[in-house]
Each structure stands twice: as C-alpha cells, then as structure tokens.
Amino acid sequence: RLYDYVSMGIDTFILECEYSFYAPYYYSLEDIKTICQQYPQCHFYVALNALYDEHDIETLKNYIDELSKLSIYGIIFEDFGVLQIVKDKQYSFDMMYAPETLNTNAMTLNVLKEQGVTSAQIARVIPLEEQLLIQQQVNMPLMLQVHGVEYIAASKRALLSNYQKASGLEFDKESQTRLTIQARNSDYAFHIYEDQKGTHIFSFTRLYMLDLLNQIHHFDYLYIETLMMSEEEAVEVASLYSDALKSFENHTYDRDVKAYMRLLYQLKTPLTRGFLFVQTVYKLE
C-alpha cells in the first residue's frame, strides 16, 4: 500500500529490516531493492536501530555493504558502531541518530554533528517548548514524532516467555496489540509484546499533533509511527496529516483544522498529548 502514501504527496519512508529493533513489518533486501526501484522519487531510510552485540557486527557490516548498492537515502541508528562502520567504509548515507529518549538538548546534537551525525530524531519525553527550542538551536535536519504509540521500554530478554514459564499461564505473547500491562494504583496501561529481538513496551494511547502544525511546521520531518495500527488506520492518519500540511501551505489551516480533528476523533483510537505540555522540574540540592 505504499502507493497510497506516495499518492498523498508523502515522499520519505522508514523501512524496517532484519536488523531493526521493532517494526510493524520487516522487509528483505530484495523487498527494499524493489521498493526503491518502484519509487525513485522518494527518500528511503533503513532502520538499523538496535544495540548490537559483538557477534552481530560482521554480518551487520555485510548488510550495510548490501545497502550501499541500493538507492537508500539514509540509515536510522542508535548504536554508534553503525555510524563507525559507515564512516570507515566512506558511505554517503544520511545518518539519522534516533535513540528513543536521549536527544533532549541542542548542545549534544551539535557536538554529534562534528562526529558524523547528519540528522536526528528529537526525544518524545520532553515538552514541546523544549523540542521547539532544540529545533532553533541545532544545525542539522530534525525529525519529530507527531502521531502514534510511544516507546516506553524494551529489553533483549524474553520477559514474557519467562513469565509464562513461571506462572503457567497461556497467552499470545507475540501479538503487538493483544497484551497490556498496568501497574497497581495506576491509570496508565501499556502494550507489551515479545519477538525474536526481545520484549517491547509501548503506550496504549497514541500521541497526536494534528492541531499543532502552526508550532511544529519548522521541523524537517514529521514522523507517524504506524506500529500497532491497522493498514486502514495508518492510511487514514497519514491522509489527515498530509491534507493538513497542504492546508497549512495554502494558508487555510486555521480554518480547516477543526474539520481534520473531527475526522481524527472518528477513528475512535485513544489519543494523548504525551509529554508535550508536561513541565520539566529540576531538583537542586
């Protein structure tokens, strides 16, 4: 269904592969090659966003060699070993540094630019005010997640399998949306699932910024996380943001945004502002 997104005017995509840490879909090298050939007008990033063990390094190097033969625009990474491999090979990928929670200040990102990082994803766990401040002070392209479930935690351990063995309970631990966990005396539930990479925990609610384009339009990339979405929901959400961006460019966004929000609410998915308007508190001792 990539055609659906391209026809909306969306031109940048993240493709997950066998070396990605979590994903709604995993694409083979042949799949990635075919996609790049079918949509030469688009930019494709490949997510190599795990923290890799030493025994993975040689095969990872070989995989990056294969990516260099394709029309891949960039690599999304978390492990600096990936950046070092690319630098040693002198490949020309855009190297987007995207740890889940670490990109929280401009100074660090400007230093990392000197080390070969060429773009970055801003952490979701800081207020919008701070995200905007970083965008103003960083001298590289930045990506901001604007919609979808939010990463909470992950482990390379098979935590659900271990719990299953200890408890004797039977449940589908591999379904991305079937299991939820909720701490005692807490109002917040989270999705949890397990795959061959480990255990993953994500928010039950979906972050949304459809009505905040006046504030976030200066970011270079606005990212929609489609993990745990049906194909229909993913297309509908992407269409709403695509239409909203066109409306913004045509100077009709302020008039149209209420209609877009009504359509978003009709999807009947749980929505949240995440940390966008939560103030950061510093305790000084």
Per-region residue spans from a language model:
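Conserved nucleotide-cofactor-binding alpha/beta core module
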Residues: 105-107
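Active-site pocket-lining/capping segments in soluble small-molecule metabolic enzymes
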Residues: 1-103, 121-285
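As written
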Residues: 116-117
